[in-house]
A protein has these predicted regions:
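Hydrophobic N-terminal alpha-helices or hydrophobic patches in metabolic proteins across all domains
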Residues: 1-165
Length: 165
């Protein structure tokens, strides 16, 4: 996956998938910071047209545009002003960072981490006009992997139907 926003940052960066450039989208208007490194899985397409979003558990901020190999261990299903917007929860593969290697599914993640992520997702848009987030539910790595597979298929179909392959 590709890092867009480092842990501890309050600037929302987004990679433009067409140009490959990293843009500073906006500063979070609240006093919140990203509780984890945040990015996306390339060559995926959610139903809202965006790549699949991922929060990566870890203690160290990673540089934007970094590529890191991760394993999904859960998913937070949400909806915002633009529609369904899933957030995969992942851990770095063991060779990158063994700190979280014992986590294999959503139920292994400490409640304090889940609560922090949920609070951030639910409130990071609070001071932005006409923006909101609703949390549907947490789910396990099986659904996370299914969502990723569907998004890969959706991306492939999109690319073929738009003559981009």
């Amino acid at each position: 996956m590709i890092i867009e926003i480092p842990k501890g940052n309050n600037i929302k960066y987004e990679i433009d998938v067409e140009s490959g450039l990293l843009f500073a989208n906006r500063k979070l208007p609240s006093s919140m910071i990203y509780p984890c490194n945040y990015g996306f899985i390339p060559r995926t397409r959610e139903s809202n047209g965006d790549p699949v979003d991922v929060f990566i558990l870890g203690d160290d901020p990673l540089l934007p545009m970094s590529v890191i190999e991760v394993n999904p261990i859960g998913i937070l299903l949400t909806e915002d002003q633009d529609g369904k917007d899933s957030k995969i929860i992942a851990k770095p593969v063991e060779k990158v960072d063994a700190t979280y290697c014992m986590l294999t599914d959503l139920t292994d993640i400490p409640p304090t981490i889940l609560n922090t992520l949920e609070h951030f997702v639910l409130h990071h848009k609070d001071l932005e006009k006409d923006k909101y987030v609703k949390i549907e539910r947490w789910d396990n790595k099986t659904l996370a992997k299914t969502i990723i597979s569907e998004a890969i298929n959706r991306y492939d179909i999109f690319m073929k139907t738009h003559n981009k392959i």
